[in-house]
Design a protein with these regions (language model features):
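Short, flexible catalytic-loop segment of classical short-chain dehydrogenase/reductase
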Residues: 108, 146-157
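Alpha-helical segment proximal to the catalytic Tyr-Lys
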Residues: 89, 133-137, 199
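Substrate-binding pocket helix/loop in short-chain dehydrogenase/reductase
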Residues: 60-73, 167, 171
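Active-site helix of classical SDR
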Residues: 84, 120, 128
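Active-site loop-to-helix junction immediately N-terminal to the catalytic Tyr of the SDR YXXXK motif
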Residues: 64, 110-119, 130, 158
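C-terminal substrate-recognition "lid" of short-chain dehydrogenase/reductases
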Residues: 179-203
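The beta1-alpha1 cofactor-binding region of Rossmann-like NAD(H)/NADP(H)-dependent oxidoreductases
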Residues: 1-2, 23-34, 66, 184-185
């Protein structure tokens, strides 16, 4: 919650705009409903939805319990479904909108020990294409960004025993471009997909 409030403060300073910050668990339907309702109350509607909830979860099948599978699917797949269910009616009222689902490259090309994330994200990619086909008539575009290696606090936590830059260098050696991506590069792509310049991109 501290990071959320800091992000709200930073955005207000940078944009001088109205920013609403709320703590919500997308695994809980009631939290999703409250988030949608308060957003509509504050801004008068919804025309952009970015489903970005997730956490690092990757291991082999034998180490995964039913509960671990369900938890990952509930967060990454059902969370997106709940938020889309709540936001789409408001987008229709506004004459259209844009939804971006954050998935991962493992959802298209999984490596070993990538479960359950690779399955949850593959389902997210399928959800994206299904909704894109269904909602196109309402001028609602739906896209997915299959994220690769991006600098984040998750990697910072993993580097406690060593240098963060050394970890990024090691990870970057596995990437064709030779480096780990910046969060701003991911954000720029999402902003493009949500903008008028991405108006002919869906699915």
């Amino acid at each position: 919650e501290e990071h959320l409030m800091q992000a709200v403060e930073d955005l207000r300073k940078e944009t001088n705009g109205c920013v609403l910050g709320m703590k919500a668990d997308v695994c809980k339907a009631e939290d999703c409903t409250t988030l949608i309702d308060q957003t509509v109350e504050e801004f008068g509607g919804i025309d952009i939805l970015i489903n970005n909830a997730g956490k690092s979860a990757a291991s082999g099948r034998e180490a995964l319990s039913d509960e671990a599978w369900q938890e990952d699917l509930d967060l990454k797949l059902m969370g997106a479904i709940r938020m889309c269910r709540g936001a789409v009616p408001h987008m229709r009222k506004m004459g259209g909108g844009s939804i971006v689902n954050a998935t991962t490259s493992a959802g298209k090309a999984p490596g070993s020990l990538a479960l359950p994330t690779s399955v949850s994200r593959a389902a997210g990619n399928n959800l994206t294409k299904s909704l894109a086909n269904e909602l196109a008539k309402d001028k609602i575009r739906v896209n997915a960004v299959c994220i690769g290696l991006i600098k984040s606090t998750q990697w910072e936590r993993r580097s406690e025993k060593g240098s963060l830059e050394e970890l990024y260098t090691e990870l970057g050696n596995k990437v064709p471009l030779g480096r780990v991506g910046e969060a701003e590069e991911y954000a720029d792509l999402v902003a493009f997909l949500c903008s008028a310049r991405g108006a002919y991109i869906t699915g």
